[in-house]
Swiss-Prot record:
The active site is at C10. Belongs to the ArsC family. InterPro entries: Arsenate_reductase-like, Thioredoxin-like_sf, Tscrpt_reg_Spx/MgsR. It comes from Haemophilus influenzae (strain ATCC 51907 / DSM 11121 / KW20 / Rd). This is Uncharacterized protein HI_0103.
Amino acid sequence: MITVYGIKNCDTVKKALKWLADHNIEHKLHDYRVDGLDLNFLTQAETQFGWDVLVNKRSTTWRNLDEQVKNSLDKTTALSVLAENPTLIKRPIILQDGKALIGFNEKEYQAAFA
């Protein structure tokens, strides 16, 4: 079973979940707001994608983040800022069975789950 990490009311997460369901791929949602977020997951995601890819700079959370925090964000501070602000994480994320996907791109999903 595939675990999709994200937030259930996110449109991009909804697209990914619908795509998985339409292709009969067993999956479950790990909602950051409901199920929490641990440092181990963030560390794995950072290793796969890099901290700068994990940060969703188009999010409302990013726009509302203190300028000093934004300007000082780097590899050493990113994970703690993301842990404190899970809606700042680009989503959805799938890290499972050698698959590492972030965001939703139908072609990438087709290639990963073919």
